[in-house]
UniProtKB/Swiss-Prot annotation:
GO biological process, one term: regulation of transcription by RNA polymerase II
Organism encoding this protein: Homo sapiens (Human)
Record's protein name: NAD-dependent protein deacetylase sirtuin-7
Catalytic activity: N(6)-acetyl-L-lysyl-[protein] + NAD(+) + H2O = 2''-O-acetyl-ADP-D-ribose + nicotinamide + L-lysyl-[protein]; N(6)-glutaryl-L-lysyl-[protein] + NAD(+) + H2O = 2''-O-glutaryl-ADP-D-ribose + nicotinamide + L-lysyl-[protein]; N(6)-succinyl-L-lysyl-[protein] + NAD(+) + H2O = 2''-O-succinyl-ADP-D-ribose + nicotinamide + L-lysyl-[protein]; N(6)-propanoyl-L-lysyl-[protein] + NAD(+) + H2O = 3''-O-propanoyl-ADP-D-ribose + nicotinamide + L-lysyl-[protein]
Induction statement: Overexpressed in thyroid carcinoma cell lines and tissues, but not in adenomas.
EC numbers on record: 2.3.1.286, 2.3.1.-
Length: 400
């Protein structure tokens, strides 16, 4: 035994005492928790005495309860009543008219009307997986631009919106007719694969989801560049990755737009990811010089306290009212006029079997030769950019 130290038996005895105290503390915590769940009138004198002697534990448990309730409220969807929503839309319309430089930030909530599930909503992919429920969705290539997508395109045509920054990978902004220069798809586009060996990078727009074989840190699609023969890669930025491609991420334009914006409209985004991008929020500017923020979302967002106005409503409902208030007609989406067909690079001979995803057709009756895609149906989400997100969340759930 070292001088002044404890013997082995003394250390073991001290450890037993420590564990006993911890167990006694846990048991006391359980007792106090059970008592706090009772109404005050139902508590016995002995229970009242125990609470009085355990003030620190009572404070800790009450704090935990408040935090749980707060998190629960944040996940709830709240809808403004129709009259209140119309009043807020009138205020939003005034802001849109008076904005000198309006930038729109969009999230998964603008595509739920196209049958593409979001992640964090009450019926979102991660929410359902956390509840142990299965997740299914229709073929994502069957999705079409929603009323919100088409409204944004019209607002850009009317020079009321200068730029769109999107978290979505579904390509619906591109397919709505919004110019490539007006979009920053920060997390990629499921229809675009690129050759990073060519300078500048050579893009290939396809009429099918190119991400069937790709995953986190594994981006090769199985096809090669028509010019240099290098393996093509998808453009998706998965959770845990940092996007490095110039296009379609277009970070340079997003940063420039944010720096010039005097108004930002957030549509259908939880902002839990976008809030982590300081360049989008002009945080280096004094508060008085930052853009005014307008948020459309049914749930709480971490930017609510900074918003000039929060509208609790579905994106399509709000945009329908907004366009009416602005006196603008919402263009109907036309599959025949979808820009993706003029932008797309056809597969070369021998590449037809390089994917099994359903290809887009100009009409639903038309099917390209060799297309092995299944008809529109609700089925488990497997593979691709969306399926990988589901798989990753499932793995996290098992670990925790």
């Amino acid at each position: 035994m070292a001088a002044g130290g404890l013997s082995r038996s003394e250390r073991k005895a001290a450890e037993r005492v420590r564990r006993l105290r911890e167990e006694q503390q846990r048991e006391r915590l359980r007792q106090v928790s059970r008592i706090l769940r009772k109404a005050a009138a139902e508590r016995s004198a002995e229970e009242g005495r125990l609470l009085a002697e355990s003030a620190d534990l009572v404070t800790e448990l009450q704090g935990r309860s408040r935090r749980r309730e707060g998190l629960k409220r944040r996940q709830e969807e709240v809808c403004d009543d129709p009259e209140e929503l119309r009043g807020k839309v009138r205020e939003l319309a005034s802001a849109v008219r008076n904005a000198k430089y309006l930038v729109v930030y969009t999230g998964a909530g603008i595509s739920t009307a196209a049958s593409i599930p979001d992640y964090r909503g009450p019926n979102g992919v991660w929410t359902l997986l956390q509840k142990g429920r299965s997740v299914s969705a229709a073929d994502l290539s069957e999705a079409e631009p929603t009323l919100t997508h088409m409204s944004i395109t019209r607002l850009h045509e009317q020079k009321l919106v200068q730029h769109v920054v999107s978290q979505n990978c579904d390509g619906l902004h591109l397919r709505s007719g919004l110019p490539r220069t007006a979009i920053s798809e920060l997390h990629g586009n499921m229809y675009i694969e690129v050759c990073t060996s060519c300078v500048p990078n050579r893009e290939y727009v396809r009429v099918f989801d190119v991400t069937e074989r790709t995953a986190l840190h594994r981006h090769q699609t199985g096809r090669t560049c028509h010019k240099c023969g290098t393996q093509l890669r998808d453009t998706i930025v998965h959770f845990g990755e940092r996007g490095t491609l110039g296009q379609p991420l277009n970070w340079e334009a997003a940063t420039e737009a944010a720096s010039r914006a005097d108004t930002i409209l957030c549509l259908g985004s939880s902002l839990k990811v976008l809030k982590k991008y300081p360049r989008l929020w002009c945080m280096t500017k004094p508060p008085s010089r930052r853009p005014k923020l307008y948020i459309v979302n049914l749930q709480w967002t971490p930017k609510d306290d900074w918003a000039a106005l929060k509208l609790h409503g579905k994106c399509d409902d709000v945009m329908r009212l907004l366009m009416a208030e602005l006196g603008l007609e919402i263009p109907a989406y036309s599959r025949w006029q979808d820009p993706i067909f003029s932008l797309a690079t056809p597969l070369r001979a021998g590449e037809e079997g390089s994917h099994s995803r359903k290809s887009l057709c100009r009409s639903r009756e038309e099917a390209p030769p060799g297309d092995r895609g299944a008809p529109l149906s609700s089925a488990p989400i497997l593979g691709g950019w969306f399926g990988r997100g589901c798989t990753k969340r499932t793995k996290r759930k098992k670990v925790t």
